[in-house]
């Protein structure tokens, strides 16, 4: 890779280094997710709703950060997808730090998902439980929920190569693609029957996209044959579906849904920069895994365009109250750059911010050119979005951290990609932890990226599993 190009105007600024990313994960994010209240009863049954201070939701005295009209109707439901996303986060925390407690929690989360939340009668996973009972008829569960039930299991399989988890992943992937595949071949259905305000007529981007980032992309290269080849074929098909039916070359964006003209408008649900950048990122990574150079080129150009559209310079007076003194001293008098959700809408949620950062970091790894925006958005994520008192990142800066759509998933993926990015840009080795022995240490790669394995070191067992510490060099997306 060529020399790192730093914009002259960013010369006085600095990017977080690898140690800062590890500190961010351990001291910025982990405190909120390692609290006793986060661990569930029994441990592994991670609660969907928690207040900003970590307390469990009390429906008789609802904390302000959860007291929104779009959240309160879901109280009483415990969502499988959120338990799986939290399992993923503990897996990443172990991956970055080797923390045995994080590994134990990831294993407990996986155990609960497998033993308690699979639909033993109909197949697939239960979307949510209410008063201990499964919600919805099986045909009313979304294919997105079926995918996100696997995101934590996929991460733990990547870390452990556990045979039971492998079996569940293979079985669930087959269930989703057998049951939800549309007769016209244009992807996967959203739901099979109307219910819970969802319609079988819906054609949703995330029904396709979240199969890929939920499990296909991470797990497919690791599976034994014939499963590996079949999963890679499905990865190829779904990426093709996204580009053929959900992508507009003219508008250079992905449609959030395609079942009606109204749902394809830029102002409609899921037609934001977050979903488009994520779809481009996944298209690039799929193209890389499958050796499809045309997809990689399209995705790189699309990411570049979207990142330009998504950045803007906010008024200093609007952001100054949020900026901590250390950053104020660095940024005063400069044109600070930020991310936004849509054209003409400068609001943004933390998950969209994370996705935009991850795409920008990936492009920087590819061409050695760090865009100026990252010199602002990475420190902002660490120092403005993170709650300095209780830890964790919310939908809003420092608030609304655990609800039916938001928890630890995006913030920990962001920390992992950030660490990989900073180590490679500094030409330092990447150190990651896995829960397997040296004999199993095949097909090791740092998350979605490629790298050379420099060293594999055996460590003491943790949480009943062997551990290895792996050093990678020459990381490339």
Q: What positions do the PLM features span?
A:
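Glycan-recognition and catalytic cores of secretory/periplasmic carbohydrate-active enzymes
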Residues: 5-477
């Amino acid at each position: 890779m060529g020399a790192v190009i730093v914009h002259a105007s960013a010369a006085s600024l600095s990017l977080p280094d690898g140690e800062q990313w590890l500190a961010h994960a351990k001291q910025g994010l982990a405190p909120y997710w390692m609290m006793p209240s986060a661990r569930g009863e029994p441990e592994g049954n991670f609660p969907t709703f928690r207040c900003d201070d970590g307390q469990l939701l009390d429906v008789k005295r609802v904390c302000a950060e959860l007291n929104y009209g779009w959240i309160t109707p879901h109280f009483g439901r415990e969502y499988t997808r959120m338990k799986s996303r939290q399992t993923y986060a503990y897996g990443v925390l172990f991956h970055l730090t080797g923390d045995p407690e994080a590994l134990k929690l990831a294993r407990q989360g996986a155990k609960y998902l497998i033993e308690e939340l699979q639909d033993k009668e109909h197949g697939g996973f239960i979307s949510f439980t209410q008063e201990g009972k499964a919600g919805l008829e099986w045909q009313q569960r979304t294919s997105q929920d079926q995918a996100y039930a696997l995101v934590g299991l996929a991460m733990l399989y990547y870390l452990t190569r556990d045979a039971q988890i492998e079996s569940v992943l293979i079985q669930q992937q087959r269930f989703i693609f057998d049951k939800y595949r549309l007769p016209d071949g244009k992807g996967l259905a959203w739901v099979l029957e109307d219910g819970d305000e969802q319609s079988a007529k819906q054609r949703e981007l995330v029904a396709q996209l979240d199969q890929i980032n939920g499990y296909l992309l991470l797990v497919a290269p690791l599976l034994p044959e014939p499963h590996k080849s079949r999963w890679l074929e499905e990865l190829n098909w779904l990426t093709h579906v996204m580009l053929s039916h959900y992508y507009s070359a003219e508008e250079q964006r992905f449609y959030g849904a395609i079942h009606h003209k109204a749902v394809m408008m830029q102002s409609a649900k899921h037609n934001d920069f977050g979903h488009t950048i994520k779809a481009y990122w996944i298209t690039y990574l799929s193209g890389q895994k499958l050796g499809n150079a045309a997809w990689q080129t399209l995705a790189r150009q699309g990411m570049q365009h979207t990142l330009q559209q998504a950045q803007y310079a906010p008024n200093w007076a609007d952001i100054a109250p949020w900026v901590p003194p250390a950053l104020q001293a660095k940024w005063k008098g400069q044109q600070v750059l930020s991310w936004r959700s849509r054209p003409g809408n400068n609001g943004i949620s933390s998950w969209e911010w994370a996705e935009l950062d991850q795409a920008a970091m990936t492009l920087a790894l590819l061409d050695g050119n760090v865009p100026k925006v990252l010199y602002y958005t990475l420190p902002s994520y660490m120092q403005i979005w993170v709650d300095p008192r209780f830890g964790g990142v919310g939908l809003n800066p420092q608030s609304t951290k655990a609800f039916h759509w938001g928890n630890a998933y995006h913030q920990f993926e962001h920390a992992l990609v950030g660490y990989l990015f900073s180590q490679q840009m500094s030409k330092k080795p990447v150190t990651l932890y896995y829960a397997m022995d040296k004999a199993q240490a095949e097909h090791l790669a740092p998350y979605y990226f490629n790298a050379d394995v420099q060293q594999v070191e055996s460590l003491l067992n943790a949480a009943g599993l062997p551990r290895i510490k792996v050093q990678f060099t020459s990381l490339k997306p």
